[in-house]
Amino acid sequence: MRAVSKKKKTPENVIALNRKARFEFHIEETMEAGLALEGWEVKSLRAGRVNLQEAYVLIRRGEAWLIGCTITPLPTASTHIKPDPTRTRRLLLHKKEIARLTGAADREGYTVVPLDLHWKRGKAKLSIGLAKGKKKHDKRADQKEQDWQRQKQRLMKHKV
């Protein structure tokens, strides 16, 4: 029997990243959700015409929704439909996952944010995270740590 290796998220699998989410929030838990998309949206995702910067996840009436995600239609999109780039898209999660997110998001200061959009076995998946907002001093400390790591890499590069 041959062991099947699991593929990691590689740069070619990732469609879009929400880099601002990791800067603005402490991500405590992540999970993966499917997306209910239309045909023109999938074509636009393949072309990489998506923006997650202003997007957020809202849980309403036992369903999870992605709001504020912009998927720009291709100019060659069908003429008989009017594509809406910022429409609300349904996230496909199990009821237990939605219940866990609802309970966690109701706590003070917690929210659910989209982290990245990627392909998995030919299907578009959204990584979402249960997050708590960072204070200004936390952001400064993270920035300072990143600068130090970058500077350390430069020093090591020049020593060799």
Curated annotation (Swiss-Prot):
Coiled coil: none
Listed PROSITE patterns: SSRP (PS01317)
Biased composition range(s): Basic residues: 151-160
MF terms in GO: RNA binding
Keyword Cytoplasm: yes
Gene Ontology terms: biological process: trans-translation
Protein keywords: Cytoplasm, RNA-binding
Principal subcellular localization: cytoplasm
Membrane-spanning parts: none
Compartments (UniProt record): Cytoplasm
Biased composition (Basic and acidic residues): 139-150
InterPro entries the record matches: SmpB, SsrA-bd_prot, SsrA-bd_prot_CS
Highest taxon of the lineage: Bacteria
GO CC terms of this entry: cytosol
Disordered: annotated span: 130-160
Family: Belongs to the SmpB family.
Purpose: Required for rescue of stalled ribosomes mediated by trans-translation. Binds to transfer-messenger RNA (tmRNA), required for stable association of tmRNA with ribosomes. tmRNA and SmpB together mimic tRNA shape, replacing the anticodon stem-loop with SmpB. tmRNA is encoded by the ssrA gene; the 2 termini fold to resemble tRNA(Ala) and it encodes a 'tag peptide', a short internal open reading frame. During trans-translation Ala-aminoacylated tmRNA acts like a tRNA, entering the A-site of stalled ribosomes, displacing the stalled mRNA.
Protein name as catalogued: SsrA-binding protein
Protein source organism: Alkalilimnicola ehrlichii (strain ATCC BAA-1101 / DSM 17681 / MLHE-1)
